[in-house]
Amino acid sequence: MRTPLRKSSTIALSLAALIAGALTLPAAQAEESEKKGTIQIEYEKPKDASLQQTYDMVRAANALEMLRLVFVSFRLPEDLYIKAVNCDGIPNAYFFRENDKPTIRICYEYLKSVREMLPKETTPEGITPREALMGQFLFTAAHEFGHAVFDIYNLPVLGRQEDAADEFATYFLLQFGGERAHRLIRGAAYAYYDYVQKNKDKPKVTLPIAAFSSDHGTPEQRFYNLVCIAYGADPKVFAIVVEKGFLPETRAKVCKYEYSNLKYAIKTLVSPHVDEKLAETVMAISWFTPPDARAPDNWLP
């Protein structure tokens, strides 16, 4: 479960065109793999008229088709369903078994809330509207996919599963590599970063007592955990998170160990279920080409 988190003169690439051009090779290779299950997608029409625009946008952007592509390298023993749905006013995304079928639901309310909170322009920290959109969307989807992975493969999880799903999502985004991973990670952290920035100068942050009983970490904890794993994975690419004070040096010192432990867990428990060659093909797709490419214009404020 996930709680919500320049314009170029030559915008040559929309997400819809990206999917249309990139889907063919991985799909063909996937048919040759030994996996039995596939990823099924569905866009439910919203009952709430105020969500019709969001529905139209995600359909035009082929948002779920993109998710099917980025997760195609997993050998699934059964079908996994990813649905965009109306959630009765609640901005959310979650995994559960619907009639015993593993299902990820991404609420139109959540997608609408992400769009509404995007920065109007590139932030002082260099986060573009596209990065904030793509990073948050992919992080949320990968978080829920992490829950699906734990369930479908019956993987043991020590500690809170929500923390494990966050770590899975962070690791997944890092696999895009280098500058692409940097852009996705800072985009994913945008919602948490915005919250932390608004409260960082306060001597105390007041939270309702119930926040400490939640199966989710607080926004501050989730932000620091995310950037710590990223910094631990590549201290050079993510050096700015320490230089700018986003990650305290006291925590930064142990991040390489946190990432190392996470990588070992992923390689031991998850990697045996992944078609590595297909994964390399998917991760090599130029998700951010050209460098100034953005999400479709109608997704941005």
What is each PLM-predicted segment?
Residues R2-L15:
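Bacterial N-terminal signal peptides that target proteins for export
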Residues I19-A27:
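C-terminal segment of classical bacterial N-terminal signal peptides
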Residues S33-I41, T206-P301:
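Pan-zinc metallopeptidase signature
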Residues E34-Y55, F150-Y153, F168:
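Acidic/histidine-rich, surface-exposed loop or edge segments in extracytoplasmic proteins
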Residues A49-M57, P91-Y94, I127-Q136, A148-Q161:
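Second-shell loop/turn segments in exported
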Residues D56-T122, R130-G135:
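Auxiliary, metal-adjacent structural segments of Zn-dependent hydrolase domains
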